[in-house]
């Protein structure tokens, strides 16, 4: 790793149809083996399904879901004097969004269903309503941070 300085932070690009950075972040996380066109197909089908289910703006549902799943605080393993402590740390907005997207995709992959677009749309609608596996993961992370609050001074 270079010690010359900090790396420039890359700004995420927008997707071609919705001109939305969150959609592009989702596409890049859902993509496997460089198949970006397939990832775009999955996302756009999921967005159409959200439109059909909720009859509201699907991008606002997406934003609401990601905002609901984004954690404020997480735990990080830190070795102190021979024992490892789970130290609670605050999370920035970009890292929080990345975690939220990862959790949403993981939860939708675990769901039973026909295809990924259907599973992703269901998970996003559930997350926007405040339920689902991704929300449970966020609450679990917050509980862990609260339980290990005593180790916060090890930061």
Swiss-Prot record:
Main location: plastid
Any one GO molecular-function label of the UniProt entry: rRNA binding
PROSITE patterns linked: RIBOSOMAL_S7 (PS00052)
Cellular component, GO annotation: chloroplast; small ribosomal subunit
GO biological process, one term: translation
UniProt keyword terms in alphabetical order: Chloroplast, Plastid, Ribonucleoprotein, Ribosomal protein, RNA-binding, rRNA-binding
Subcellular localization(s) per the UniProt record: Plastid, Chloroplast
CDD domains in the record: uS7_Chloroplast (cd14871)
Pfam families: Ribosomal_S7 (PF00177)
Record-linked InterPro entries: Ribosomal_uS7, Ribosomal_uS7_bac/org-type, Ribosomal_uS7_CS, Ribosomal_uS7_dom, Ribosomal_uS7_dom_sf
SUPFAM superfamilies in the cross-refs: Ribosomal protein S7 (SSF47973)
Family: Belongs to the universal ribosomal protein uS7 family.
PANTHER family listed in its UniProt record: RIBOSOMAL PROTEIN S7 (PTHR11205)
Subunit structure: Part of the 30S ribosomal subunit.
HAMAP family named in the record: Ribosomal_uS7_B
UniProt function note: One of the primary rRNA binding proteins, it binds directly to 16S rRNA where it nucleates assembly of the head domain of the 30S subunit.
Protein name (database record): Small ribosomal subunit protein uS7c
Species this protein is from: Ananas comosus (Pineapple)
Upper taxonomic lineage: Eukaryota, Viridiplantae, Streptophyta, Embryophyta, Tracheophyta
